């Protein structure tokens, strides 16, 4: 339906899509007209804006995004707090890498700036073809268990995942600002 309405869809997954915020109401209205039920909501079969930003209770939207591929993206989001002040944050996903590891890795690459900038810089490096290593044990602050063939359980002393995205193979989707 969004495509039929010429709404840009930046990334989709099984139960989500990123579209232009100012077109959400158009899409939900048309959906209701066509199918006789509400599209927007938190029930099964419904969609909703799932950005969450501490201190904001109203509308929250993405101001810029890097989409590396399915389940690998960053949105810099903003909303207004109760004092009508702008609050800026982020919404991140990286399949196979916990959010705490994203923060840990971003902090290694960029110092002395806020988390939004650190994370944006790390995603931007990936967007431009750099390989980034993610220490999934976060320098010993996380534990990952290993189930051995002899029915014993141990823990991993090293666990690094190196990711890269190759634009020549069409893996990269886009940067939207």
Language-model regions, residue ranges each:
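C-terminal, non-catalytic extensions of nucleic-acid polymerases
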Residues: 1-10, 18-177
């Amino acid at each position: 339906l969004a495509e039929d309405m010429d709404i840009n869809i930046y990334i989709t997954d099984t139960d989500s899509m990123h579209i232009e915020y100012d077109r959400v109401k158009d899409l939900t209205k048309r959906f209701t007209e066509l199918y006789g039920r509400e599209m927007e909501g938190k029930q099964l079969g419904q969609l909703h804006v799932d950005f969450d930003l501490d201190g904001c209770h109203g509308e929250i939207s993405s101001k810029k995004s890097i989409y590396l591929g399915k389940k690998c993206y960053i949105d810099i989001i903003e909303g207004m707090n109760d004092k009508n002040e702008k609050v800026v944050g982020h919404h991140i996903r990286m399949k196979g890498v916990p959010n705490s590891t994203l923060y840990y890795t971003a902090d290694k690459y960029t110092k002395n700036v806020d988390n939004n900038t650190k994370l944006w810089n790390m995603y931007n490096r990936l967007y431009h073809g750099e390989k980034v290593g993610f220490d999934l044990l976060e320098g010993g602050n996380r534990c990952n268990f290993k189930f051995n063939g002899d029915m014993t359980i141990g823990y991993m002393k090293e666990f690094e995942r190196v990711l890269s995205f190759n634009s020549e193979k069409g893996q990269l989707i886009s940067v939207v600002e």
